[in-house]
């Protein structure tokens, strides 16, 4: 049976008070709508139809690489009207899941259950039991069968005691959608076309409406303002933290951990507080990440220790490496095993060989460092001439003295030594001592100037 996913994403999101369309607001590093599209893809849906409206150009631009059919809702006349807009492109066979771009965290397994129960009845929905149902549509049942949805404002006092509510997520036969949607009426106080009216149509046709409830309440929570967005972010992050801990990761405080992408982990990984992981990252066995670190699209091999407040982006780190605190690995940083990168060292588009060290206050950009070399404090690779970047090559077992400037393009041969304070502008042969600085001048019995009395 074919599966279509219809995503309603046309709302403006006025309460967000943002120039950004609501469905593009980020949650865990991905737009709200991106979470829903990802789930639809996990279901192997045959069609994904997204209904856009406010900020439509921005929304389409954000997801231009996705295989999506876009349908415009020029006027926001209700949820029923939104789904009506899909009829010209909606298949006549199979089932459609109706989801929302601002309800981002409904899980694949929940929707698979909904598809399963709906396949025999032709219509199913997700409901939820809550302690305080105020403001939500109530599920009216007779002999445990759904008969109607009554909005809160229209509910009697007895009906308002019902704690089972409508989440708005449906699975409906496409044949029935083609039959029911044209019959929707806007004869109500709001003058809108309500999707909930298809429930009454199903009952009138003698269909039994299947229903399921999610395992986790936050799956069906929507986002209307920044408070709700922040609350859902924390719920989601806590679930991700729990999943990692169940896989053997030690998180010092699960409530102070953010995963904004995917993380592949080995055994006995330890992550301290306030660590942010973005994009696609991988941590090998026995890796330790200190407090306040940010990792983005980075792979760290087994046994490496990262001290607090280090930032990595598009970097690869070898085994048993020591990094930080306050180190920065920029895109193209590639560290071999047993490298030491210390405090306030920045590495960009540079490979560093086995066992080499840059322990203090150093910039290595567009460079190649061999094995077993020592880069002294304050060393700078001067890679930019104001127009172009140039490469510095440092061989194996090289010693670079403190406060040296290596003006690229330049190479330092294996076993060479550069004296402290040098500005190296020419290639240094292997096993050579090179130094370049002004001669030291001494003035005996020198008296510093005295401050003038006011």
From Swiss-Prot:
What this protein catalyses is:
alpha-D-glucosamine 1-phosphate + acetyl-CoA = N-acetyl-alpha-D-glucosamine 1-phosphate + CoA + H(+); N-acetyl-alpha-D-glucosamine 1-phosphate + UTP + H(+) = UDP-N-acetyl-alpha-D-glucosamine + diphosphate
Q: What is its EC number?
A: 2.7.7.23, 2.3.1.157
Listed under GO cellular component are: cytoplasm; membrane
The protein's matches in Pfam families, at most eight in alphabetical order, are given as: Hexapep, NTP_transf_3
Where, by residue number, does UDP-N-acetyl-alpha-D-glucosamine bind? 8-11, 22, 73, 78-79, 100-102, 137, 151, 166, 224, 330, 348, 363, 374
Q: What does this protein do?
A: Catalyzes the last two sequential reactions in the de novo biosynthetic pathway for UDP-N-acetylglucosamine (UDP-GlcNAc). The C-terminal domain catalyzes the transfer of acetyl group from acetyl coenzyme A to glucosamine-1-phosphate (GlcN-1-P) to produce N-acetylglucosamine-1-phosphate (GlcNAc-1-P), which is converted into UDP-GlcNAc by the transfer of uridine 5-monophosphate (from uridine 5-triphosphate), a reaction catalyzed by the N-terminal domain.
* Protein's recorded name: Bifunctional protein GlmU
Q: Which organism is it from?
A: Acinetobacter baylyi (strain ATCC 33305 / BD413 / ADP1)
């Amino acid at each position: 049976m074919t599966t279509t996913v219809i995503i309603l994403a046309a709302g403006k999101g006025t309460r967000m008070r943002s120039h950004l369309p609501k469905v593009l607001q980020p949650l865990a590093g991905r737009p709200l709508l991106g979470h829903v599209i990802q789930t639809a893809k996990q279901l192997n849906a045959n069609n994904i139809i997204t209904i856009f409206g406010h900020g439509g150009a921005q929304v389409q631009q954000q997801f231009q690489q996705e295989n999506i059919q876009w349908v415009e809702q020029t006027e926001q006349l209700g949820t029923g009207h939104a789904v009506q807009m899909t009829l010209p492109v909606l298949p006549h066979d199979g089932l459609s899941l109706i989801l929302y771009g601002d309800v981002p965290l409904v899980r694949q397994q929940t929707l698979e259950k909904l598809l399963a129960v709906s396949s025999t009845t032709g219509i199913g929905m997700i409901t939820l039991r809550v302690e305080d149902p105020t403001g939500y549509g109530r599920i009216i049942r007779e002999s445990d069968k759904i008969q109607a949805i009554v909005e809160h404002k229209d509910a009697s006092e007895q009906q308002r005691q019902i704690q089972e509510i409508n989440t708005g997520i449906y699975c409906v036969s496409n044949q029935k959608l083609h039959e029911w949607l044209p019959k929707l009426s806007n004869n109500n106080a709001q003058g809108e076309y309500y999707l909930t009216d298809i429930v009454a149509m199903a009952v009138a046709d003698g269909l039994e409406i299947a229903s399921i409830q999610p395992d986790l309440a936050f799956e069906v929570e929507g986002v209307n303002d920044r408070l709700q967005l922040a609350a859902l972010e924390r719920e989601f992050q806590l679930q991700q933290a729990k999943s990692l801990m169940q896989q053997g990761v030690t998180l010092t405080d699960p409530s102070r951990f953010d995963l904004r992408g995917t993380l592949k982990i080995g055994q006995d990984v330890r992550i301290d507080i306030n660590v942010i992981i973005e994009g696609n990252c991988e941590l090998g066995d026995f890796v330790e990440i200190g407090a306040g670190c940010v990792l983005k699209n980075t792979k760290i091999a087994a046994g490496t220790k990262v001290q607090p407040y280090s930032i990595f982006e598009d970097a690869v780190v070898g085994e048993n490496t020591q990094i930080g605190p306050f180190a920065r690995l920029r895109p193209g940083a590639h560290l071999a095993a047993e490298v030491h990168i210390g405090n306030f060292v920045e590495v960009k588009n540079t490979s560093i060989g086995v066992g080499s060290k840059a322990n203090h206050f150093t910039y290595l950009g567009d460079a190649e460092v061999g094995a077993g070399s020592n880069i002294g404090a304050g060393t700078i690779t001067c890679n930019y001439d104001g127009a172009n970047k140039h490469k510095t090559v440092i061989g194996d077992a090289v010693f670079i003295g403190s406060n040296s400037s290596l003006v690229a393009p330049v190479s330092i041969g294996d076993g060479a030594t550069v004296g402290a304070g040098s500005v190296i502008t020419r290639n240094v042969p292997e096993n050579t001592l090179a130094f370049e600085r002004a001669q030291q001048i001494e003035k005996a019995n020198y008296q510093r100037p005295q401050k003038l009395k006011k």
